[in-house]
């Protein structure tokens, strides 16, 4: 189906929602945002909505789970997907409905907590900048939230991995697989404050290239970062049970809810989930940067 035909199909669906389903403006907007997530995913996979099979939709659903989207949000998105394919069948675009056997996640299934941007701001504001580690801790939280790193990726981040003039960092992920991740101007600013303090430290031999150091001049461990974040959450009055991984999931959720392409989010997280193996063969760095600039709250114009 041509791009123009696809646009006409979506236009007819939106009209159907307005007239037949009598949807309000806000609900209609939400349905269209969720539909765009699916259509962007299918376009990246080279799939036509009129030819999609159950397996394709299961891969899309698995991708939502992989990036840590809460079960309730997954159910909402999949509800919109079902509505779309029911319309395609009703309107004669398809003879079948591939969503008939598509399962939704259990609402009660456990997924990590997610912080809002305001809660991340509270977390950072609770840090005492008069202490030697203040700017370091703020930079850690901001890099985790702005770049979506695993805690192990953060502890192993090197100065030689930073390309701050280009606003990218090189991350060594699972299985020693490298990826480039855009970094926000705010994260770069926080790193700059930390580097001003870092240059006055006595650094142990062999540790000079690590970005984040403890007071003894050695690189941080995962446990050190976990303890720091839990203490700051308590200081900020955040009642949620959080960890460094919470900030990674918050990064992914903020991007998805902001309208970013699911495949791009998976690439930024360093995932090789179902249907997304070798995703970097399809997504270049300019696309990654554009998605971050357009859809992450640290970059969106307010």
Where are these regions (language model features)?
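Conserved catalytic core of the tyrosine transesterase superfamily
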Residues: 1-302
């Amino acid at each position: 189906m041509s791009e123009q035909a696809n646009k006409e199909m979506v236009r007819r669906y939106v009209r159907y929602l307005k007239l037949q389903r009598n949807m309000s403006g806000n609900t209609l907007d939400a349905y269209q945002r969720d539909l765009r997530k699916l259509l962007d995913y299918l376009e990246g996979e080279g799939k036509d909505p009129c030819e999609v099979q159950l397996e394709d939709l299961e891969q899309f659903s698995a991708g939502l789970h992989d990036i840590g989207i809460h079960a309730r949000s997954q159910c909402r998105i999949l509800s919109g997907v079902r509505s779309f394919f029911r319309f395609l069948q009703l309107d004669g675009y398809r003879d079948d409905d591939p969503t008939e056997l598509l399962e939704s996640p259990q609402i009660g299934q456990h997924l990590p907590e997610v912080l809002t941007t305001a809660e991340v701001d509270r977390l950072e504001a609770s840090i005492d900048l008069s202490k030697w580690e203040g700017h370091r801790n703020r930079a850690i939280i901001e890099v985790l939230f702005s770049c979506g790193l695993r805690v192990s990726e953060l502890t192993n981040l090197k100065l030689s991995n930073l390309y701050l003039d280009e606003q990218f960092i090189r991350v060594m992920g699972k299985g020693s697989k490298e990826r480039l991740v855009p970094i926000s101007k705010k994260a770069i600013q926080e790193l700059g404050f930390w580097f001003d303090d870092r240059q006055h430290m006595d650094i142990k031999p062999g540790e000079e290239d690590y970005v984040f150091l403890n007071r003894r001049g050695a690189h941080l461990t995962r446990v050190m970062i976990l303890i720091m974040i839990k203490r700051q959450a308590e200081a900020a009055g955040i009642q949620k049970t959080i960890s460094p991984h919470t900030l990674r999931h918050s990064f992914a959720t903020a991007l998805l809810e902001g309208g970013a392409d699911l495949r791009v989010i998976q690439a930024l997280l360093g995932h090789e989930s179902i249907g997304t193996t070798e995703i970097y063969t399809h997504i270049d760095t300019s696309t990654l940067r554009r998605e971050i600039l357009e859809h992450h709250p640290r970059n969106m114009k307010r």
